[in-house]
Amino acid sequence: IKRNNFNVQIGMYKTLVSAEEDMPNILLLNIDLLVDIDNGSIQIRKNKEQKYSIFVNKITYALAENLCVRTKSQETSCSILAN
C-alpha cells in the first residue's frame, strides 16, 4: 500500500476517556477503509485546541477524504492535515 503524508483528526473530546469510549465506534464505522492500516498509526492525543482527538496518521489523501466524508456523515468533526 502506498502511504502519503496525510493525517486525519477525528472528533473533539474534552477528556481522554470520552475519546477512548468513542474510538471503537469510529473504527467500526470505517473498518473496511482501515483494514490495511497499521494499528500504530491510530492514536488519541491532544490537538492544537487542547482537546483530545483520534488521529489516523500517514495515510493517502484519498483514504483521508473517504474517512472524513463518512465521519462527518455521523456528525463528528474530521479534518485532513498535511504532515
What are these regions (language model features)?
Residues I10-G11:
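Local beta-strand/beta-hairpin segments that build beta-sheet-rich folds
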Residues I1-N4, K14-N83:
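Extracytoplasmic
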